[in-house]
Amino acid sequence: KVIPMPLNVVGTTATEEDFELSEMVSFVELFNTTVEKVQEVLPKLTASMQSLCPTFYSAIQEDVDGMLLKSCTISKLTPGTKINPHSGDIDSLRLHFPVIEDEGAWLSVRGRKRSWKVGELFAFHDHDKHWAQHNGTHDRIVVIMDYALSQLEDRGITIEKWEEELAI
């Protein structure tokens, strides 16, 4: 199956009316599974973020008003899925926190292809052309967080600084 644009299981605007009952049941199962997995890998993700991008980590720790985080979604990519190349439209720094990986699933950003690894943070500017494909055998689940670039820049964090810290 080919998905022309990113398809996330749930977005910040999803309501119960957006889903059939069977979809809600599978969403609840996915949500519960994801929460359990996030709790398992959170210490590793936190350590990864602290060591790889200390400036950003410090900024989100101080973000008590929640102004930096624009959206948070759970993305499930099933085997055989391809998301066509596209560019985001919300001008954000997009972070991927993998909670269930499959070596056959990958994401390409600016022509650089990489797989998701549980416990390893991956981030990019959502305006960069990106696409994904899943040739593996089981679902890949990622928590995706979008952070407001303008708010980050007000705190001295630019895309260039982020890429420098992550050696992108």
What is the role of each PLM region?
Residues S115-K129:
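Conserved metal-binding segment of the jelly-roll/cupin
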Residues K1-V64:
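Non-heme Fe(II)/2-oxoglutarate
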Residues K76-T78, G88-G104:
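Short, conserved beta-strand element in jelly-roll/cupin
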